[in-house]
């Protein structure tokens, strides 16, 4: 696949571009050396580069720009600022070998790994990811979703490959907003989004009026995969996928089917009883993990926990304990580390579900907040707007 004029892979050649700042849009000069391709696909190509000005690593994602439309990914990334979302440093346009082709280049914060790769490292050694790491990563994913969902944005492609990690510090950041969209009630959306294995059942049923709850289903699938070492609902097609879901959750009732897509209510499905999750997972998986999973993997979208509700689940209580330390499972000789910042909530985040703040924020973390919880007046949550 031709992705336009290639970014030369030459660690000694300095490339200069006139770019715009990811936050302010101000014009700035960017100088970098490029080292290697770290990803490619139908969207384009991702290069790892070294920024001269800041003496830091970054990733440049290059995508072909359709001149008829504004790039939704760029518009969304420019307004997203969160500790668990990859940061847009700058952006610029280049032309391809064919002068009609215009490429958008997103200069992004660099993270060394994906949760997909981290999970594979354990699987190859016939090990399970330590439960504390599962808690840490899923909590941070939920925190990023609480933030984007409150802004009206649905990611629509939650999967292990789109969850970036800094395994040294236990930090997770959500990336790839190429499928993301501001969902507006009453406006139809395409159902053929989200990668298989992680697709919510309403998408398999072809629903076009789905909600942010599709991201919660995908999160449940990712969490299950980290504990199992393989996808919970593998399937080569939509029907395959549905069969795998039914094998575990049982046949959806007519009422449940109605909440996903009323057009399928008269469809006859084989009657299969649900299987207890305790039979699907090993005995080492704690009951509170299975309880959280069951509350995210519900057929009826409105029955699924919201991201903020899920963060309050007892499964994550260990993260709220000030004595919890993160052991380096890749280097057992290294001394345990403190957990990353998990409670540095902004006033916006504290306004998402003010009724949950007391449960969400442990007492030892409250003094560091930008506001006093007892006196906090929630700010109005405004949905994100893009032209």
Curated annotation (Swiss-Prot):
Annotated binding of ATP, by residue: 38-46, 61
Localization (cell): Cytoplasm; Nucleus
Is Cell inner membrane there in the keyword field? no
Q: Which reaction does it catalyse?
A: L-seryl-[protein] + ATP = O-phospho-L-seryl-[protein] + ADP + H(+); L-threonyl-[protein] + ATP = O-phospho-L-threonyl-[protein] + ADP + H(+)
What Enzyme Commission number(s) apply to this enzyme? 2.7.11.1
The protein's gene is named gsk3
Protein name per UniProt: Protein kinase gsk3
Q: What does this protein do?
A: Interacts with cdc14 which is thought to play a role in the initiation and completion of mitosis. Involved in the positive regulation of mis12.
For the Protein kinase domain, which residue ranges apply? Answer: 32-316
Q: Which family does it belong to?
A: Belongs to the protein kinase superfamily. CMGC Ser/Thr protein kinase family. GSK-3 subfamily.
